[in-house]
Amino acid sequence: MPAGEKLVSLFEPHADIIVKGGRAVQYGHKLNLVTGKSGLILDVVVEAGNPADAERFLPMLDRQIARRGAPPRQTAADGGYASRDNLKPAKARGVQDVAFHKKCGIAVADMVKSQWVYRRLRNFRAGIEAGISVFKRAYGGARCIWRGLDHFKAYIWSAVVAHNLMLFARLKSP
């Protein structure tokens, strides 16, 4: 029986089985987050099922291009998104530097213009992970107590708004 057809919760029938390499199986929904250099969460997508991260890189990039009207100059992504099949189309869409945390056989020179840029983007991505940790722990992004898929999505978006408002409040005026 395919995972999408399995009922894993009587109370939350929309819950999915989330399997990530070497970790314990989780039940819920996979999220894809996009953040900017300020730390603001710019976009969140609640995925149906458990799609591979690599399959979601280009659709998430396309969402940002559609929203901004232009591609980002640089992007940094988790190792799960790394593949040549993602690198070449991202470059073709106008992204100058694409840094994946895991290289997966891709040369740094193919991803970015220099080793220095790669290190900067890799370190930036580590900061994103810290922001995601704060989002999960301080704003409820790890566990939703609202029932139903639509309520889950509303809960996540309300957590994003709370997270972003706190970042705005912490900004110092010039």
Question: Where are the predicted features?
Answer:
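Generic, well-ordered alpha-helical scaffold segments in large soluble proteins
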Residues: 36, 60-67, 93, 131-134, ...
